[in-house]
């Protein structure tokens, strides 16, 4: 199974570099994969040395230049833990020649890590993925197969129009049994989009008047409800710090002050940790 995936992956790399492989090329790739396995060849450049010149030359870009170390390692050092995060914005901005091989590899690692344990796959800023043809098709596939691996798919986007305008909107709508809507004062202006997501005008009004960063509107097969996490000022000082400027400030404080960054960050918010000792946040 791994060899079949590797064969398809190499075929994709060649296609991205304007080499249309025929049966002879694929047979050669498969033979060389077997030979590389038998001889414990792990690096891409060593594997390429086994190939015919036209195949080897097409793959040169993946072992040279500033990105040449991405695929040409002696061993795979990517370790997945019970909580793994990948920053996709930079990868998706690299262009298909680089982004696609990386995505295919990450997809493979994620899927192999799903062995039936309860899992949650979160796609934050999903508009980036919905706008990418390969990622979009992978999302379509995940909707249908991840549940068999006991994995739930969670997609988040700041703009619901990106989801509605996606070519896989029918799949997104039919396969997401639970939807959580953030407060949106402009909801009335795009009521038609909300109605495409199954909401009525009363529900749109609730979203338009909900309190930002405090209330959320949930719809599911079991019913609908406006709810709040009831976070106090201490919890909000951290849970509400999600914008890039705040995250960067926190990282700078941690780098400069170590564990003391917590107190300094709270002071910038007019709060003191001592005031909350022994109390709920």
Regions found by a protein language model. Name each.
Residues 1-151, 155, 164-167, 203, ...:
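P-loop NTPase motor domains
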């Amino acid at each position: 199974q791994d060899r079949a995936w590797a064969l398809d992956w190499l075929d994709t790399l060649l296609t991205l570099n304007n080499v249309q492989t025929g049966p002879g090329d694929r047979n050669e790739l498969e033979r060389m994969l077997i030979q590389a396995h038998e001889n414990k060849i792990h690096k891409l450049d060593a594997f390429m040395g086994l190939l015919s010149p036209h195949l080897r030359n097409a793959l040169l870009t993946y072992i040279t230049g500033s990105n040449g170390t991405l695929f040409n390692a002696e061993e795979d050092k990517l370790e997945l833990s019970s909580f793994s995060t990948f920053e996709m914005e930079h990868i998706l901005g690299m262009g298909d020649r680089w982004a696609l091989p990386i995505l295919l590899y990450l997809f493979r690692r994620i899927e192999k890590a799903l062995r039936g344990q309860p899992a949650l796959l979160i796609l934050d800023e999903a508009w980036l993925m919905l706008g990418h043809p390969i990622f979009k098709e992978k999302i379509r596939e995940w909707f249908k197969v991840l549940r068999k691996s006991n994995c739930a798919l969670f997609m988040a986007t700041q703009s619901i129009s990106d989801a509605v305008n996606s070519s896989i909107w029918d799949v997104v709508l039919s396969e997401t049994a639970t939807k959580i809507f953030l407060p949106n004062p402009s909801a009335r202006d795009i009521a038609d989009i909300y109605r495409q997501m199954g909401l009525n005008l009363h529900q749109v009004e609730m979203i338009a008047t909900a309190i930002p960063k405090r209330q959320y509107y949930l719809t599911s097969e079991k019913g609908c409800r406006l709810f709040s996490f009831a976070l106090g000022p201490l919890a909000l000082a951290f849970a509400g710090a999600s914008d890039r400027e705040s995250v960067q400030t926190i990282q700078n404080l941690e780098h400069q002050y170590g564990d003391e960054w917590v107190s300094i960050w709270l002071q910038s918010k007019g709060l003191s940790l001592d005031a909350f000792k022994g109390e709920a946040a």
